[in-house]
Amino acid sequence: MRTVEVEDVEFIYSMRQNEQKTKYLSKVTGSIESQKEWIKSYKLKEEQREEFYFVLESKKKEKLGLVRLYDFRKDSFCWGSWLIKDNAPKTTAIESALQVYEFGFYTLGFDKSHFDVRKGNDKVIAFHKRFGAKIIKKDDINYYFNFEKSDYEIIKEKYRRYLNE
């Protein structure tokens, strides 16, 4: 997992334009050029440690997906915009989730994570529940989850083999 660069614009744009993959995400409008400008502005947020946008990569540097960390609160971070290519290895989801939590909990120093998942996005809802995240609220559109660092430290042992330490 590495932060996005302007050179990733075509990959990001193609992933964000894939209607099957982005069915449960906010829509992206505009062109590759406008996406490039958006990335440039996002890099400023990274410099301020306000938000981070990552490309998920294989050990051979193949681009496998995207994920963002944002909405930083006193002790909690949100993550989302999680997209994984269709032909990515089956372990990409678990590996990227572990990397997100490692970064959020240990690099940034947060104690918990909060995020929402659209209703109907059953695979992602099931993934987070298996991982130990708890639904704390729901509305007509979303389920709202919390996941504590202490819970991560327990589940991390189960999935340690997927961490590239």
Question: What is the predicted role of each segment?
Answer:
Residues 20-40:
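Conserved GNAT-fold acetyl-CoA-binding loop/helix
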Residues 71-80, 110-111, 141-143:
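A conserved beta-turn-beta hairpin within the catalytic core of GNAT-like acetyltransferases
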Residues 1-14:
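A short beta-loop-alpha structural element at the N-terminal edge
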Residues 114-125:
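Conserved beta-strand-loop-alpha-helix junction that forms the acyl-donor binding cleft
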Residues 139-165:
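C-terminal "cap" of GNAT-fold acetyltransferases
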Residues 33-76:
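Acetyl-CoA-dependent GNAT
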Residues 90-104, 126-130:
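Conserved acetyl-CoA-binding loop-helix of GNAT-fold acetyltransferases
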